[in-house]
Each structure stands twice: as structure tokens, then as C-alpha cells.
A protein has these predicted regions:
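C-terminal beta-signal and adjacent terminal beta-strands/loops
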Residues: 387-394, 712-715, 776-784, 805-858
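Periplasmic-side early beta-strands and strand-to-turn transitions of outer-membrane beta-barrels
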Residues: 156, 165-166, 172-174, 186-290, ...
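Outer-membrane beta-barrel translocator/receptor signature
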Residues: 90, 107-109, 121, 130-139, ...
Length: 858
């Protein structure tokens, strides 16, 4: 489907929508409900606010079986949420912009706020959602009101406040496929005339749907627990205080990975006695020699204070303290061969402590409403990572280098270096016994810390220019400072070898031995000839026109140096510090054409501070290598890379229309959005490449329609059309390695995404019933830039449905099914770990269904 065809289709829908009020007047159905919006830090309605925002209300979330933030993408086409190799590595993307997974030093571009409190990492927002009023998704840069981490958009989760009027509650039980059991309960009510409370809890357990044929737990399971308590104080009409405390825990085996293309390394896995399921993306089966571990604990407390100083002014304070602990250990080769140590093979242990404080002063006059505020953010991150070889990695490396244990080039190097040392020639300074390289227990361990402090000053004013025209002006000044430390312990002997030097030594030694025999055992004569001859042979670089063994043959083994040693910092050259500041702004003009239709035009900017690479792939910039050498800090076989990515700055220009009649509403946004310095983090098969794209832009349109053609039926359509492009990305990563991606289309961004729903309500006896169907479509797109589109493309065509009954006594029953047509698509893809020529990917969840029973009481 072309963009022009899609645009014509949507314009036809818009035209039909404008005709609808005339027909609706004849049928006289019920009116559309008014939808509240508070994510802009003041209360308004969806149709009045001149901002591109999607609002999901509690009833929609319940009927759609939305259990955590990841499920929101099925109802908001502009939102994409992708889970990667663990439960907490999740990317949030709006309009094609966003990142933040796979590295604790990379903050998200989409800010997630729960009851006004920022969740700095996606793992802290993935618990089962508590009692909800609504979820609001602000599309486009929102840094004017939200600061440094809203350059692509904001997800605002609003939960119900405790009641001061009456006690109420509910309890529910869900049973579903894969032995799922979900229990939820809550109670809400007054403790006195001025104090209310609420308490809610949930337990969610489900077996995995991705079988481990090597034994052990199936992957893709759920095992979650959460509890949340609130106190609400209203000592007077002018003052109220809301205190929230929450705790959640997750312990799951996640996530199933499929072999998309079995390259030549697959034979090596089989030769070692290992297994894999080749070329089968949707078999939902694999081989793992140990079960992945995903453990999370998230807890926090917040206090919101509101004071109506007078009829024209209000003070708000929101204080929060949060803690996130995350431990992961996964079998990243995704085979049953014991290439990694099962206890510490590929582990990540992260602790994050976050404190935030926001003050807002807002007010209104006859001709304007205004708000000023300040925000402070203080976060400490401690991370320990490790990648440790298992019992079979040496044999695997021997096979990959074309030999068998005892005869491969790795053994030749070990024996050659040992001979050089024993012969008194220049060497690495120690004997290298056979079997040293890739020994069990070798690897790297990294410990990183990051102290991040930031503050913002912001303000916004809405000025009435007349009865129907409003001008909005806003600005935000943000400062962000990060202090980072990195310390690595490297025991991977082979990765620490400089193969340029090693190759020269081996050639020198071979020439010396030959000349020693030719000169009758005279070492002086042999040394003179060997020195002159070996200089002409090595170590010259290898290239396409000068491949091994014509040049230094040892260089052909560099792809096996998965874990090259690093340089710890801070040091005398790298201070481990970034300081960023930026002023973002918003300007918008809104005009009420009629009482039912308003239009707006606006522009705004967003900002995201520098992101640090807190992983084994954090390496000094090439520009710092000379100074590091002069300071004597270089280590053998060091390579350049990136320590951090510089800030990204976004700009959007937008035109919108919002219309609401009795039975139909229409919201339309046309936008042109770009990000300078987009922070890209791509997995290359042995590590991650963190880099700034010069510029990424997207032109697009978004449309939301709600329609009640009759009292018993409601239909919705939400669609997003995007035309994305890397305007400049010379430092990108393609299928063959480093590549200039300028002028290409970013992968994973669908040109067309839409969600259509239909809901029919009816009565059966004394029960009110409904039937709801959802259809989600996303057109075909390459999944990721460094995996060929022929191997990993994605097209979505999914159907969800639910059927429910509610009785007057507060009892409800709901049958639900997700992906009932068993649609198959990839969530993401990547070059297989240490398996050149092979590709892997994450398949979507297959069809699930279940029954929910719920009882309300008061």
C-alpha cells in the first residue's frame, strides 16, 4: 500500500466523518462521553487541548486486557514498545523515535510517569498496572513541561485516588492459557472525614510458551507480584496531600529467541554435541543449556501536596524516592552447547536509586492561565556485568578456525609464542601453554557507576487573544551532569593479544629457525638474516586485495577477539564527566472555529542529555588514543569506540484539528519532526554500537475517530502514517558492518499503522453485556538495519476480542482472546552472538485466551 493510497483512504474517512452529524441527528443515539486530560499538568478535555494526545480510559484497558505498559501499543498506533532479551530491556518509541534499552546508561527518549512520578528506566514501569483511571500518550517532544527525557513523547499513567465518601473494592480472578493465574484485589474508602486510603495487590503467574528442548523451564513465563497503598488527606478545602507507596517483584524466564538463519557456525555447535532449531522463527522451540534468569524488584514512595493559595493561584509539590534492583543472566548463544558458564555466563546486576522533586505554581486571570515550576533529579546507578566462557568455548573456537583441538591456528600461536620465549627471543613475557586461549572461566567483568544530577526551570502561559483564539508560549531550561566510573577485570587471554605484534614475532621466529639451520647453528648470522627478512614479511595490514596469509595470517583471527581489554576511567585523559544544558520551547496558536471544531498550529523542541555506555563495549574515542598513549595508559590490543553519545535535540512543527459532535469525534494531526544527534544503540553480534545519528526526520499524519452510529454500537479508528528517513548517519551499522546510512529509511518504523475497534452492547435478562473486537495492522518493514530484510521483516495483522457480562449485584465475567488469529511477526532481530553468518530474533507471543471473573463491592 502506498502512502498516497493510504492518504486518500483516510481523507475519505475524514469526509465521511464530517457528514456523520447530519445522519446522526435522525437516529438520536447517546452522546459521546467527555474525556479528561491532565498530562499537560493542568486539567482539560481531550477535544479542547491543542496537543496530539491519545487517551485510554479504564473501561477500554479492562476490556482489552491491558495488563502492563507494553500492551498499550495495540491501542495507540504511534506507540511502539519492543521487549528484547529480558523482561526489563524494553524500548519505548513514539512516531519512530525512541530508545533506552540494553544499557543502564541510556535513558529513554519517551518519558513514563505514573501519578506524576518519573520512572527513569523501562523496567520500573513494567509491573502489572494498578487501579487505573486512564493512560495518556503525548506524541512528539514534551520537554517544555517534562524536561530532559521527553524528546520523543510522554506516557502518563493516572490511577484512582482514595475516596472520602464510601468504602468500595473489587476482587478478580483470571485463568488462561499456559496455566495462567492472575489474582487482583483492591479496597478503597475513608478512614475519617478528612482521610482516605486504598490498598491494591496483584499476583500474575503463567507458564512459558517457548519450549526449551534441552530441558528446564519454558521461556516467556510470567511470575509477578505487586502491592500498592495510598493515603489521601484533605484537612481543608484548600489543602490536600496524597502519599503513595508501592512494591513489585518479578522473577521470570525470558525471553525466547528463534534462529532465523542458520549460518556456517551452526555446524560447529552440532559438532560440539549442541543443538539448535535452525531456520524456524515461529516454532516456539529452542535449545538452552541453562534457564535465563530475570529478577526485578521495584519500590518507591511519593508525596503530592496541593494548596489552593487563593482563587487565582495554586501550589503543587511532588516528591518521590524510588529504588530498582535488576539481575539478569542469559544463555546468549541460544544453543545447548555450553559456550558460557551457566552461573555467570552473561550477567547484569543493576541497582538504581532515584530522587525527584517538582514544584509548580499555577494560576489564572480573566485573560490568561499560567504555570511556572522547578524540577530536580538525582540518580545513582551501580552496574556489574560479566561474560565468562564455559567448558566448550575453546573447542568451538578451534572448529571455527578450521582445525580440531590440538591442531588449530590457536594451538599454533600458543606453541609458537612458547617456543619464542624459551628460545630467548622477544615475546609477550610469559610462556603460553597449549589450551590457554578461551579457557573455562576466562572472560571480562565490568563494574560501572553513574551519578546523574539534573534540574529544570520551566514555565508556560496560555493567553486569550479573543473569544476563540489562544496563544500558548512555554520554555524550559535544563542542566544535566553525569559522573561515570568504569573498571574492568579482563582475563580473556586471546582477546588481549595484539595479533599484529604476535604475527610479527611468529614470522621472525620461523625465519630465525630456518636461518639458524642454514648457517650451521650460528645465532649471530641467523639473527641478522631473520631481522632483515621478517621486516619485509610482517606485520602488514590485511585487506581485500591483500588477504591472509599473504599478509600477517594471525590477523584473520581478530573476529574471535570478542572481549578486547579496556581502559578504566576516570583517568588523566578521560574524566568520566558530561555537562549538558539546553533551552527548549513551545509556541502554539489555537482557534475555535465553532463550538464543536477547533484547529491549532504549533512548534516545539525537545532535549535528551548525553547517554553513557555502561557496558563492556564502552571504549575510548579515537581522538583520545594519542593522549592515552602519551600518558602510558594504553593496554594491549585496545580499539577505539564510544564512551557516550552526545545529546539529542528534537524539533516538531504540527497542524491539528479537533472536532466533536454528539455522536462522532475526529482528531487529526499533521507533523514534521526531526531529531539532531539521535542516540542509536545497535547490537552487532559481539557487542553494542552506541552512536549519534547526524539527523533523523519523520513527516506524518495521525487520525483518531470515535463514532456512535447507534446507542448500542461504538467504533473507533486510530491510524498513523509515517515517512521516516536518516537525513545524515555516516556512523551507522549495516548488514556488512560500519556503513553510511544517510538517505536510507530507518528500520522498524512502519509507514502505516492502524487500530480499529468495534464494541456492541446488549442486555440479557438482568445482565448488561458487550462484545468487543480489535484489529491491529502494521505494514511490512525491515526489522533492524544490520539484519537483511529477506531474513527479518515484520508485518502485523492481529485480532483481539473480548465478551463480557455484568450483573446488578456487582459480578462480572469476561472471556478474552489476544492474537486470536495467531498472527506471527518478529519483535526484533540481531546477528547471532559469536556466530558469524547466523541471525536470531524474538518472535511475538502466540494466541492466548482466558476467563476473568470480577466482583465489585461497596
Amino acid at each position: 500500500m502506498t502512502n498516497s493510497t493510504t492518504c486518500r483512504g483516510i481523507l475519505g474517512l475524514v469526509a465521511a466523518t464530517f457528514m456523520t452529524p447530519v445522519m446522526a441527528q435522525e437516529q438520536e443515539p447517546t452522546f459521546l462521553d467527555e474525556i479528561t486530560v491532565t498530562s499537560t499538568k493542568r486539567q482539560s478535555t481531550l477535544q479542547e487541548i491543542p496537543v496530539a494526545v491519545s487517551v485510554l480510559q479504564a473501561a477500554d484497558l479492562k476490556e482489552s486486557q491491558i495488563l502492563d505498559v507494553k500492551d498499550l501499543q495495540f491501542l495507540v498506533p504511534s506507540l511502539r514498545i519492543t521487549q528484547l532479551q529480558s523482561s526489563g530491556n524494553t524500548n519505548f518509541i513514539i512516531r519512530g523515535f525512541g530508545n533506552g534499552a540494553n544499557n543502564a546508561g541510556i535513558e529513554p527518549s519517551v518519558g513514563v510517569f505514573i501519578d506524576g512520578v518519573y520512572r527513569s528506566r523501562s523496567a520500573a514501569a513494567l509491573n502489572d498496572l494498578p487501579n487505573l483511571e486512564r493512560i495518556e500518550v503525548l506524541r512528539g517532544p514534551q520537554s517544555t513541561l517534562f524536561g530532559k527525557n521527553a524528546s520523543a513523547g510522554v506516557i502518563s499513567v493516572v490511577t484512582a485516588k482514595p475516596s472520602l465518601d464510601e468504602t468500595s473494592g473489587s476482587a478478580s480472578l483470571t485463568v488462561g492459557e499456559y496455566s495462567q493465574v492472575l489474582v487482583k484485589a483492591d479496597v478503597n474508602g475513608p478512614l475519617s472525614d478528612t482521610v482516605g486510603f486504598s490498598l491494591s495487590g496483584s499476583f500474575n503467574q503463567r507458564d512459558g510458551y517457548y519450549d526449551n528442548l534441552a530441558g528446564g523451564d519454558a521461556l516467556g513465563e510470567l511470575d509477578r507480584f505487586g502491592v500498592r497503598g495510598q493515603l489521601y488527606f484533605e484537612p481543608s478545602d484548600e489543602v490536600n496531600v496524597r502519599i503513595i507507596a508501592d512494591y513489585s517483584k518479578l522473577d521470570e524466564a525470558c525471553c525466547g529467541v528463534a534462529n532465523l538463519l542458520n549460518g556456517p557456525t551452526g555446524a560447529a555447535i552440532v559438532a560440539l554435541g549442541g543443538n539448535l532449531v535452525p531456520n524456524a522463527p515461529f516454532a516456539y522451540q529452542g535449545y538452552y543449556d541453562f534457564t535465563p534468569v530475570n529478577e526485578f524488584e521495584s519500590s518507591g514512595v511519593s508525596a503530592e501536596f496541593d494548596w489552593d493559595i487563593n482563587d487565582m493561584m495554586m501550589l503543587t509539590s511532588i516528591t518521590s524516592l524510588r529504588k530498582l534492583e535488576r539481575f539478569e543472566n542469559g544463555d546468549v548463544d541460544f544453543t545447548s552447547a555450553p559456550l558460557l558458564d551457566p552461573s555467570t555466563g552473561n550477567r547484569t546486576d543493576v541497582d538504581i536509586d532515584t530522587f525527584t522533586q517538582e514544584f509548580r505554581l499555577s494560576g489564572a486571570t480573566d485573560t490568561a492561565s499560567w504555570m511556572v515550576g522547578a524540577y530536580f533529579f538525582d540518580e545513582d546507578v551501580t552496574q556489574e556485568t560479566g561474560l565468562i566462557y564455559g567448558t566448550a568455548f575453546r573447542a568451538y573456537a578451534d572448529i571455527l578456525t578450521g582445525g580440531i583441538p590440538g591442531t588449530s591456528p590457536l594451538w599454533d600461536i600458543e606453541n609458537g609464542l612458547t617456543g619464542l620465549f624459551l628460545g630467548g627471543l622477544p615475546s609477550l613475557g610469559s610462556v603460553v601453554p597449549g589450551g590457554t586461549f578461551f579457557g573455562e572461566g576466562q572472560g571480562n567483568i565490568e563494574i560501572s557507576t553513574m551519578d546523574n544530577k539534573a534540574f529544570s526551570l520551566f514555565g508556560q502561559i496560555d493567553i486569550d487573544l479573543g473569544d476563540r483564539t489562544t496563544l500558548t508560549l512555554g520554555a524550559n531550561y535544563t542542566e544535566d551532569e553525569k559522573d561515570v566510573t568504569f573498571n574492568q577485570t579482563a582475563t580473556d587471554v586471546f582477546s588481549g593479544l595484539d595479533l599484529v605484534e604476535v604475527g610479527g614475532l611468529l614470522i621472525y621466529g620461523a625465519v630465525f629457525q630456518s636461518e639458524f639451520a642454514s648457517n650451521g647453528g650460528d645465532p649471530v648470522a641467523a639473527n641478522a638474516v631473520a631481522s632483515a627478512t621478517s621486516a619485509a614479511l610482517a606485520p602488514i595490514p590485511c585487506s581485500a586485495t591483500n588477504p591472509p596469509p599473504a599478509c600477517n595470517p594471525s590477523l584473520a583471527l581478530q573476529p574471535l577477539q570478542f572481549q578486547r581489554p579496556n581502559i578504566n576511567f576516570p583517568n588523566s585523559v578521560e574524566n568520566g564527566n558530561t555537562k549538558d544544558d539546553d533551552t527548549t520551547w513551545t509556541v502554539r496558536l489555537a482557534f475555535d472555529m465553532t463550538d464543536d471544531v477547533n484547529v491549532y498550529v504549533g512548534a516545539g523542541t525537545g532535549f535528551k542529555a548525553s547517554s553513557w555506555n555502561l557496558s563492556r563495549d564502552s571504549r575510548p574515542f579515537a581522538s583520545d588514543l594519542p593522549a592515552l598513549g602519551s600518558a602510558g595508559l594504553l593496554v594491549p590490543n585496545i580499539v577505539a569506540g564510544t564512551r557516550y553519545a552526545s545529546p539529542e535535540e528534537s524539533t516538531v512543527y504540527e497542524i491539528g484539528l479537533k472536532a466533536s459532535w454528539d455522536v462522532v469525534s475526529l482528531n487529526l494531526a499533521l507533523f514534521d519532526q526531526e531529531i539532531e544527534g539521535f542516540q542509536s544503540n545497535i547490537f552487532t553480534g559481539t557487542g553494542f554500537s552506541l552512536a549519534n545519528a547526524g539527523k533523523q526526520s519523520t513527516t506524518g499524519a495521525e487520525i483518531d475517530i470515535r463514532w456512535l452510529p447507534m446507542e448500542a454500537f461504538e467504533a473507533t479508528l486510530a491510524a498513523t502514517i509515517l515517512d521516516p528517513k536518516y537525513d545524515s548517519f555516516p556512523g551507522g551499522v549495516g548488514v556488512s558492518g560500519p556503513e553510511d546510512l544517510s538517505g536510507t529509511q530507518p528500520p522498524g518504523i512502519h509507514e502505516l499503522s492502524l487500530t480499529a475497534t468495534g464494541r456492541y452492547s446488549f442486555n440479557i435478562g438482568n445482565a448488561a453485556g458487550y462484545a468487543r473486537v480489535e484489529y491491529i495492522y502494521e505494514d511490512e518493514v525491515q526489522v533492524i538495519e544490520n539484519v537483511p530484510a529477506s531474513v527479518a521483516s515484520r508485518e502485523v495483522s492481529t485480532i483481539n476480542a473480548s465478551f463480557g457480562l455484568a450483573w446488578d449485584n456487582g459480578f462480572e465475567a469476561m472471556l478474552w482472546g489476544r492474537n486470536i488469529n495467531n498472527d506471527e511477526y518478529l519483535l526484533s532481530a540481531f546477528p547471532s552472538v559469536a556466530q558469524a553468518g547466523s541471525y536470531s530474533g524474538y518472535p511475538n507471543q502466540p494466541r492466548t485466551y482466558g476467563l476473568t471473573l470480577r466482583k465489585y463491592f461497596d
